């Protein structure tokens, strides 16, 4: 094959000193070693696999070149080419080694003259394929060769890594053949027939120094932020490199790239493709040297990974574990004094990979690591809690009850369980009479009874828990059941029952016998009715025998104690007893149970009279009626007595009496009697009988009661039998205290007879369960209806002579069929039923809003910035719903384009448009009622009506006797102009301040002709009322917050400043109302 023509290199100038060349080359070496490249080369090591295999023809062509030019180094003259062939090869290899491994020697590529690179490439390929380099320094007598690599090189056999290096070298050599253009430089000097470098630095190559250079090159590659790898698929196959997950060949390729980029002079502006690219073969003596360097580096790092030996040439610093932190390198120091710490921060990631955990890690509890349950995944912070939680899954129950087989895992659950046995020791069991629920704990039954509170019932049974000396309210209603017994140290046993019957007449008008205790539901609306105690006796004896002493009144129910009909003297005696108890005086309240007939015998025999007596002499023996054991027939209707602590009752009386006194001063409440039927007892009962009252249900009594020791205060019980509300308790006790204080009675009577305001009717407020509306009834009729006022009650007390009038049972429960709420008045139920219908009779007079109840309408009116008086709402509703005769007199009406609202009243329409935003307030029109004429100017519609519809009977607002409804200013003139000399209208600055004060002389001027017939008619809306005071309050709706009117658009402002700002918008055309005066 013909030889390729070789170009002779230009001869370098001989006058340039070697020292200058060395200094320039030294400075370039500093720049290469320390700084990162800002002009990345286009050639990348990622393109190696593109030309992995060279074509056979190219390789044969390259191998067939002449040996004269096989070195790839042209000589200045042709006759010296053969003489320096071998020396040039050795010298070039040494220089290339210096350019790669020594910071003081730069690249060789820029120094070669532009010549053909084919012989050099073929020679390098042959060297790499051979896998070894034979250096024969004595062949040409050149013993002074600067290459001194013999002692430090130990060649390893070819490996997979060496093959990759060979492929990389071939790839880079081919790149050099295609795009490498050499430029003349002063890096080599021709001296004595051969090329000599301008630097005398020798290359002392060792594996340790090679490792340093490799790390420095990797550091430079990592610093190059502009380097972007476009093809991830062109990587080499995985190789376990000690540097990182990348292979060592990738590191070496990056090294060659950085060397080629640093070899450019600062003044050279060639693009990266035109710059010289140094092949791997020119950096080292052979591929074997590269292979050995990689092997030594891997061995060094692997040895360091296992253990840090002190004799390691370059131990990896701790900063290598954080390869992500990339900092710019410091300014480059001289290459001879380059410190190793500059390489520490920017080395490639070590193949150690995973950072080892610190050896001094704290225990789990000390470090705060949470504990997680492996079964349910619950995360717990403390180990003790975690162990306790694991008991749930393991099933270990270490706590066992000593009295039963009950076991639990937690101690607090065992303590709660032991309370069951405490009640069982006393023989107590609590059972619900409305369902099969049974509990040994009273509190559980009390909670259970809440599920029955929304259903009407005439009887319910709750076993009473004998509490500690605390007053607790709990429901106690029963037919038959277990009896609570409390065994005290003295052997005292308290036993009692209450008599009830299961007749179906208890929910109606009553039946024979003593009725059960009825529980009235408390509605959630309008101060609902509290619980009431109702007892019925249809067969009560007609005659009422007066007892000898007021202290002889005995009762079997706690309800009669707080009823409204006890006498003043009896209440006084009771309060005196309570006062004595508060003074630490011993008072024995021994309660005995009186006889009650059977339910079957109630129709044939008279029922005993209910009364109660406080017995200060407990030693006095009582008749045999209560002390004898009860017969089986009498046992079924026996009454369970319960004692009441005098101290607890007194404290509750004083507290609730004070609260009721405050309530009396705040608002007047009418009285209404309680639904309590009092049974009369024969006069044969001893006056010294001890009191016995209770509402507890229990079993039959089988033995007489024993008296408490003298001076011993019985344990405190619940004051009330049912779980009544605080309001009812306060009202009950207030009635008792009211009987004692006659001043309170007179104050209440006077307050009930008079009402100060004509606008507040009796039905406006929710009445108390003790109030009465039957003022006009006779005393007998009042008794039949179960409602008696306070004065009539006193009359009945005086007539009966005993303060215990007879009450007829009256069922006042009115349940709602829709939601189940129960009310005590039919009027309240009727008002409540309106919520379940679709009727909305409460309509807003300013907009189409309608509400079901009055409160919602009042709430809605706040949108219009109107402070409405509650009494005006009904009149407004009646005026809006009624069709006024003035509706046909308006010749035009206003229409809102936003929501379609239409009205004939200007003020009403302005109030409506104020609900919209500013942009929407101009979207309206004024329409003629007689034709289809539409305009936005009120002056135009008036002109239209005056010319087109003059013969119509309808009158315009300006022609009517009443003031114009289109302007508030005309209203102020008519309202304050005639006979009113005290009130005046103040107009300052054209702000039209409306101050309307209707006085007796001014009102006839509004509607002189129609006042006797229609009353007071509002000129702003269809409101009509009959009283002047109500009309005055209604005018405040329109005038209290809108006092300043715009004479252009009739919009109202609250302050003069706002009106001035608003008028400015009429001076500029806005597309809405024009600024016309009319």
From Swiss-Prot:
GO molecular function: DNA binding; NuRD complex binding; zinc ion binding
Subcellular location: Nucleus; Chromosome, Telomere
Pro residues composition-biased segments: 326-338
BP-aspect Gene Ontology terms: chromatin remodeling; establishment of protein localization to telomere; negative regulation of DNA-templated transcription; negative regulation of shelterin complex assembly; telomere maintenance
Superkingdom of origin organism: Eukaryota
Pfam families from the UniProt entry: zf-C2H2
Keywords: Chromosome, DNA-binding, Isopeptide bond, Metal-binding, Nucleus, Repeat, Telomere, Transcription, Transcription regulation, Ubl conjugation, Zinc, Zinc-finger
Transmembrane segments: none
Biased composition (Basic and acidic residues): 1-10, 945-957, 976-985
Motif (RRK motif): 3-5
Database matches in InterPro entries: Zinc_finger/UBP_domain, Znf_C2H2_sf, Znf_C2H2_type
GO cellular component term, pick one: nucleus
Cross-link (Glycyl lysine isopeptide (Lys-Gly) (interchain with G-Cter in SUMO1)): 670
Region (Disordered): 1-76, 307-341, 466-490, 594-640, 945-990
Annotated zinc fingers (C2H2-type), start-end: 371-393, 399-421, 430-452, 814-836, 842-864, 894-916, 926-949, 1016-1038, 1044-1066
Subunit structure: Part of a transcription inhibitory ribonucleoprotein complex composed at least of the circular RNA circZNF827, HNRNPK and HNRNPL. Interacts with the nucleosome remodeling and histone deacetylase/NuRD complex. Interacts with RBBP4; the interaction is direct and recruits RBBP4, a component of the NuRD complex, to telomeres.
Function, in words: As part of a ribonucleoprotein complex composed at least of HNRNPK, HNRNPL and the circular RNA circZNF827 that nucleates the complex on chromatin, may negatively regulate the transcription of genes involved in neuronal differentiation. Could also recruit the nucleosome remodeling and histone deacetylase/NuRD complex to telomeric regions of chromosomes to regulate chromatin remodeling as part of telomere maintenance.
Protein name: Zinc finger protein 827
Organism: Mus musculus
């Amino acid at each position: 094959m013909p030889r390729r023509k070789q170009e002779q290199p230009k001869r370098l100038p001989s006058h340039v000193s070697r020292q200058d060349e060395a200094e320039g080359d030294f400075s370039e070496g500093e720049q290469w070693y320390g700084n990162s490249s800002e002009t990345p080369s286009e050639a990348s090591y990622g393109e190696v696999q593109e030309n992995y295999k060279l074509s056979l023809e190219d390789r044969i062509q390259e191998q067939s070149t002449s040996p004269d030019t096989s070195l790839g180094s042209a000589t200045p003259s042709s006759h010296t080419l053969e003489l320096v062939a071998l020396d040039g090869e050795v010298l070039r290899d040494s220089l290339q080694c210096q350019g790669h491994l020594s910071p003081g020697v730069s690249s060789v590529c820029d120094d070669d003259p532009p010549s053909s690179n084919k012989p050099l490439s073929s020679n390098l390929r042959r060297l790499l394929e051979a896998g070894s380099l034979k250096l024969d320094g004595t062949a040409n007598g050149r013993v002074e060769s600067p290459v001194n690599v013999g002692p430090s090189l130990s060649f390893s056999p070819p490996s997979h890594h060496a093959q990759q290096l060979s492929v990389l070298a071939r790839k880079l050599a081919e790149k050099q053949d295609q795009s490498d253009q050499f430029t003349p430089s002063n890096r080599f000097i021709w001296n004595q027939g051969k090329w000599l470098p301008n630097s005398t630095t020798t290359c002392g190559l060792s594996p340790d120094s090679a490792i340093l250079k490799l790390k420095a090159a990797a550091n430079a590659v990592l610093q190059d932020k502009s380097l972007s790898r476009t093809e991830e698929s062109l990587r080499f196959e995985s190789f376990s490199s000690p540097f990182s997950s990348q292979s060592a060949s990738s590191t070496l390729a990056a090294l060659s790239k950085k060397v080629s980029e640093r070899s450019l002079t600062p003044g050279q502006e060639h693009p990266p493709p035109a710059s010289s690219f140094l092949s791997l073969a020119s950096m080292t003596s052979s591929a074997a040297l590269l292979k050995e360097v990689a092997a030594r580096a891997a061995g060094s790092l692997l040895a360091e990974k296992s253990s840090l030996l002190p004799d390691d040439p370059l131990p990896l610093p701790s900063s290598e574990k954080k390869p992500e932190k990339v900092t710019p390198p410091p300014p480059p120091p001289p290459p001879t004094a380059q410190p190793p710490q500059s390489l520490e921060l920017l080395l490639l990631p070590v193949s150690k990979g995973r950072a080892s955990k610190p050896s001094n890690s704290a225990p789990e509890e000390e470090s705060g690591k949470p504990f997680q349950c492996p079964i349910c995944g619950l995360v717990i912070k403390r180990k003790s809690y975690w162990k306790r939680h694991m008991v749930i899954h393991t099933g270990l129950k270490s706590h066992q009850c000593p009295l039963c087989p009950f076991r639990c895992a937690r101690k607090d659950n065992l303590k709660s369980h032991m309370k069951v046995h405490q009640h069982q020791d006393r023989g107590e069991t609590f059972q619900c009479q409305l369902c099969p629920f049974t509990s040994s704990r009273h509190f559980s039954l009390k909670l259970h009874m809440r599920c029955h509170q929304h259903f009407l019932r005439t009887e319910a049974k709750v076993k009473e828990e004998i509490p500690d000396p605390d007053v607790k309210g709990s429901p106690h209603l029963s037919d038959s059941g277990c009896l609570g017994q409390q065994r005290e140290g003295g052997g005292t046993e308290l036993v009692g029952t209450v008599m009830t019957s299961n007749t179906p007449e208890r929910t109606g008008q009553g039946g024979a016998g003593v009725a059960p205790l009825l529980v009235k539901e408390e509605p959630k609306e309008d101060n609902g009715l509290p619980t009431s105690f109702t007892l019925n006796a249809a067969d009560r004896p007609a005659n009422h025998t007066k007892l000898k002493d007021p202290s002889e009144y005995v009762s079997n129910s706690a309800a009669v104690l707080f009823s409204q009909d006890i006498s003043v003297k009896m209440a006084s005696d009771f309060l005196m007893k309570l006062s004595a108890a508060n003074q630490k005086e011993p008072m024995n309240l021994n309660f005995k149970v009186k006889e009650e007939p059977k339910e079957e015998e109630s129709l044939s025999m008279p029922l005993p009279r209910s009364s109660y007596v406080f017995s200060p002499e407990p030693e006095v023996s009582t008749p045999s009626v209560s002390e004898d054991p009860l017969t089986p027939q009498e046992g079924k209707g026996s009454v369970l007595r319960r004692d009441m602590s005098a101290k607890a009752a007194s404290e509750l009386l004083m507290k609730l009496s004070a609260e009721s006194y405050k309530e009396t001063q705040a608002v007047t409440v009418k009285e209404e009697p309680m639904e309590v039927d009092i049974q009369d007892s024969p006069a044969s009962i001893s006056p010294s009988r001890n009191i016995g009252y209770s509402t507890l249900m229990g079993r039959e009594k089988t033995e007489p009661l024993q008296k408490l020791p003298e001076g011993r205060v019985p344990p405190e019980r619940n004051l009330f039998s049912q779980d009544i509300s605080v309001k009812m308790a306060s009202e009950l006790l207030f009635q008792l205290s009211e009987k004692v204080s006659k001043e309170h009675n007179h104050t209440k009577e006077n307050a009930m007879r008079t009402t100060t305001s004509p606008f507040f009717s009796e039905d406006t407020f929710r009445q108390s369960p003790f109030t009465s509306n039957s003022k006009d009834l006779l005393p007998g009729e009042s008794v039949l209806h179960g409602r008696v006022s306070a004065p009539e009650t006193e009359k009945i007390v005086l007539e009966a002579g005993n303060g215990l009038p007879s009450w007829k049972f009256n069922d006042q429960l009115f349940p709602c069929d829709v939601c189940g709420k129960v009310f005590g008045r039919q009027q309240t139920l009727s008002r409540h039923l309106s919520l379940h219908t679709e009727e909305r009779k409460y309509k807003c007079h300013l907009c189409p809003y309608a509400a079901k109840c009055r409160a919602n309408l009042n709430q809605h009116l706040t949108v219009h910035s109107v402070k409405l008086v509650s009494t005006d709402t009904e009149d407004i509703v009646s005026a809006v719903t009624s069709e006024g005769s003035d509706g046909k007199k308006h010749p035009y009406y206003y229409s809102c384009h936003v929501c379609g609202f239409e009205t004939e009243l200007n003020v009403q329409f302005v109030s409506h448009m104020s609900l919209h935003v500013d942009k929407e307030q101009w979207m309206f029109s004024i329409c003629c009622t007689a034709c289809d004429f539409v305009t936005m100017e009120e002056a135009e519609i008036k002109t239209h009506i005056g010319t087109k519809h003059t013969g119509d009977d309808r009158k315009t607002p300006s022609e009517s006797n009443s003031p114009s409804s289109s302007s508030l200013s005309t209203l102020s003139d008519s309202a304050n102009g005639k006979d009113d000399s005290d009130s005046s209208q103040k107009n300052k600055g054209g702000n039209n301040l409306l101050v309307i004060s209707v006085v007796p002389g001014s009102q006839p001027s509004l509607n002189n002709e129609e006042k006797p017939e229609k009353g007071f008619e509002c000129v702003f809306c269809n409101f009509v009322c009959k009283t002047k005071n109500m009309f005055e309050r209604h005018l405040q709706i329109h005038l209290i917050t809108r006092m300043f009117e715009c004479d252009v658009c009739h919009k109202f402002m609250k302050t003069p400043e706002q009106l001035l700002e608003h008028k400015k918008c009429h001076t500029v055309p806005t597309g809405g109302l024009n600024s016309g005066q009319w």
